[in-house]
From Swiss-Prot:
E.C. code: 5.4.99.12
Keyword Secreted applies: no
NCBIfam families (UniProt xref): hisT_truA
Enzyme class, first EC level, given as a word: isomerase
Keywords associated with the record: Isomerase, tRNA processing
Catalytic activity: uridine(38/39/40) in tRNA = pseudouridine(38/39/40) in tRNA
Top-level taxon in the UniProt lineage: Bacteria
UniProt keyword annotation of Translocase present: no
BP GO annotations: tRNA pseudouridine synthesis
Record protein name field: tRNA pseudouridine synthase A
Length: 245
């Protein structure tokens, strides 16, 4: 068997998420069907991150196996042909060891959350950013974010449906940058809990609006109770950037 690693970008707006589910449209399904159309093989695609409905990706990594060898550049062209007209594209493909696993071999995952902070909405980036009209104090958000760096129990920031065995995660990066009218939050960790990034963003926005004091983020973290954290930020502002191996 030949194992291929592909790098994918997609707009999550019209998808139920990455993972295949009965009765709804997923990114995994679209790609698996495209691979079947040119290879004649039923494959299972394994992704590095299982993004939720509405979440986008710039560098999602996935792997699949084929019984026959195909040139990687031909796979890119074939997949991109057959995924039309969906907002999905493959921009890299390489042959890898059969020991490689897109999910379990990953050592780090990186996300970005985009906020447009101005009095009027972004038409060009509709469903691609979270528009917040109230001015945000980015410095306060940055100060609050430092409480989340490192290894912690992130129970307060996980969803009620999270299936992870442990709430203990290690946040290796949380960086907040303002570029003109856009605020970008970069978060990195070996792995994340379900809704963890979006719940963190929702809580930091409360700090940015001066509804919460900076220290409240530490209180929320220490409480280990989802009910005391802020609202879940909308899915459409979140992007899976890349996975590292």
């Amino acid at each position: 068997m030949y194992r291929y690693k592909i790098t994918i970008e997609y707009l999550g707006t019209h998808f139920s998420g990455w993972q295949r589910q009965a009765g709804v449209l997923s990114v995994q399904q679209i790609l698996e069907e495209a691979i079947y159309k040119f290879s004649g093989e039923q494959v299972t695609l394994f992704g590095s991150g299982r993004t939720d409905a509405g979440v986008h990706a710039i560098g999602q990594i996935a792997h699949f196996d084929l019984s026959k060898y195909l040139e990687p550049y031909k796979i890119i062209k074939a997949i991109n042909y057959f995924v039309r007209p969906y907002a999905v594209g493959v921009w890299n493909c390489e042959l890898v060891s059969n020991n490689f696993h897109a999910r379990f071999s990953a050592t780090s995952r990186h996300y970005i959350y985009r906020i447009v902070n101005r009095t009027y909405p972004s038409v060009i980036d509709l469903n691609r950013v979270w528009w917040i009209s109230a001015p945000l104090d980015v410095l306060a958000m940055q100060q609050a974010a430092t409480y989340l760096l490192g290894k912690h129990d992130f129970t307060s920031f996980r969803s009620s449906s999270c299936q992870s065995k442990s709430p203990i995660k290690t946040l290796t990066e949380i960086n907040i940058i303002k570029e003109y009218e856009e605020i970008k939050l970069y978060l990195s960790a070996p792995s994340f809990l379900h809704y963890m990034v979006r719940n963190i963003v929702g809580s930091l926005v409360l700090v940015g609006k001066n509804i919460w004091q900076v220290e409240q983020i530490k209180n929320v973290l220490d409480a280990k109770d989802r009910k005391v954290a802020g609202p879940t930020a909308p899915a459409f502002g979140l992007y899976f950037i890349k996975a590292e191996y």
